[in-house]
Amino acid sequence: QARMKAENLKNENELQSYFIHRMESILKEKGKKLIGWDEIIDGGLAPDATVMSWRGMEGGIKSAKAGHHVIMTPTEHCYIDLWQGEPSVEPDTYSMCRLKDSYSFNPVPDSVPAEMILGGQGNLWAESVPTFRHAEYMTWPRGWALAEVLWTGPSKTDWDRFWPRVERHFVRADQAQINYARSMYNAIVTPYYTEDGVLEIKLDSELGNLDIYYTFDNTDPDNFTPKYEAPLRIPKNATWLRIVTYRDNKPIGKVITLTIKELEKRADNTRHVVGNL
């Protein structure tokens, strides 16, 4: 508070900006350059700072337009410590970044001068990644997706051509005993409430050539149980939904088991988020 009063700073954001400006001047004296996470935007950027844009793309876009170099690393595409598939069958963490999300990353939006974007970066924070094998699982195949999109312009990326290459990399990873995630084969479960308040469940997958089978009767699903064709409504007295994916009449994804209460909770959370937009 004394420093804020002495420098006539109105709030903590301006205090942070004051600190960053001082740090930049010290670094310049040492022949170094300041790079900071995009919180350094708050309160005013130092003149020559480079911004690591992680809270989405907007901070990076704004900074690039203002003449600052930017490294794009938005959470929704680049945080590979997040779930990469159905949370109930993934290691515990706090949000979602699927393989397809990483592959859809374009670090150079059309609205900014390309020369101001230095590149992109994938981030694997280790708070919930206790072992090297776990780190491998979180890194691959999303690391391959980020490598391709960061080295290839968006005009040359193609999801339907990419994921078959991922499968070829799986063979190489098996030979090298590298631990990787097969989450792209698992079903995507999206519960929601219709306009008339009825819970429905949409099932999908990241790949376009998988069949999805399900049960509501507490038995394990296979290719002889009902095949998903359209959004599901929950039968009376059902307490569990079980789902599995098949390809060429062979199981390929994990069996996903969710209680109806969990589905209701997820649908409620989605409804609350949408309602607050």
What are these regions (language model features)?
Residues 82-198, 206-210:
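Substrate-binding clefts and catalytic carboxylate motifs of secreted carbohydrate-active enzymes
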Residues 14-22, 55-58, 115, 134-138, ...:
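Generic recognition of stable, solvent-exposed alpha-helical segments in well-folded globular domains
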Residues 19, 32, 47-50, 61-99:
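Polar, glycine-rich mid-to-C-terminal structural blocks
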Residues 157-277:
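Short, compositionally stereotyped local motifs that mark structural "simplifiers"
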Residues 39-41, 54-56, 75-77, 123-127:
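Active-site beta-loop-alpha junctions enriched in small/polar residues
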Residues 27, 51, 143, 214, ...:
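Hydrophobic, well-ordered secondary-structure elements that form the walls
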Residues 1-68:
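Active-site neighborhood of glycoside hydrolase catalytic domains
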Residues 24, 28-38, 70-74, 153-159, ...:
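Acidic/polar loop patches that form or flank catalytic/metal-binding clefts of enzymes
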